[in-house]
């Protein structure tokens, strides 16, 4: 799995990130899992064509001392479709900016 990992988090930093994600993302099916929705204007052509598969999101997993941001763009309604793929350059930039905002707003030093 391609992902971006922020590790060596203190318990307080992890809790602050978890709180940020609760306020700004959709909760996943298990504790510590979140979905960051991708804006329509950065979807790939095939994702735009597959409107019924949307909305599209990337997963985030909060662990004991780290947070993992998946670079796989998933469908909300379909597990197996050609519109599910790794993030494009523009989508990766969106995720990096999202991560930078978390680190800045929550004053994460890790």
Where are these regions (language model features)?
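Terminal, regulation- and interaction-focused segments at domain boundaries
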Residues: 1-19
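Long, compositionally biased, intrinsically disordered segments
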Residues: 2-5, 29-33, 101
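Hydrophobic transmembrane signal anchors and adjacent membrane-proximal interface regions, especially
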Residues: 3-7, 48, 96
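Residues in well-ordered beta-strands of folded domains
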Residues: 7, 35-37, 61, 70
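Short, surface-exposed beta-strand/loop "edge" segments at domain boundaries and coil↔beta transitions
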Residues: 12-15, 43-45, 76-80
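Ser/Thr-rich, low-complexity intrinsically disordered terminal regions
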Residues: 16, 22-55
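Short, intrinsically disordered, mixed-charge
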Residues: 19-27, 101-108
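C-terminal basic regulatory modules in eukaryotic proteins
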Residues: 54-110
């Amino acid at each position: 799995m391609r992902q971006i990992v922020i590790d060596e988090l203190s318990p307080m930093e992890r809790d602050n990130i978890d709180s940020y994600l609760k306020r700004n993302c959709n909760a996943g099916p298990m504790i510590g899992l979140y979905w960051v929705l991708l804006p329509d204007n950065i979807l790939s052509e095939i994702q735009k064509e597959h409107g019924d598969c949307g909305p599209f999101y990337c997963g985030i997993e909060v662990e004991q001392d780290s947070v993992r941001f998946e670079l796989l763009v998933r469908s909300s309604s379909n597990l197996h479709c050609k519109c599910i793929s790794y993030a494009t350059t523009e989508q990766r930039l969106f995720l990096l900016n999202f991560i930078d905002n978390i680190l800045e707003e929550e004053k994460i030093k890790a």
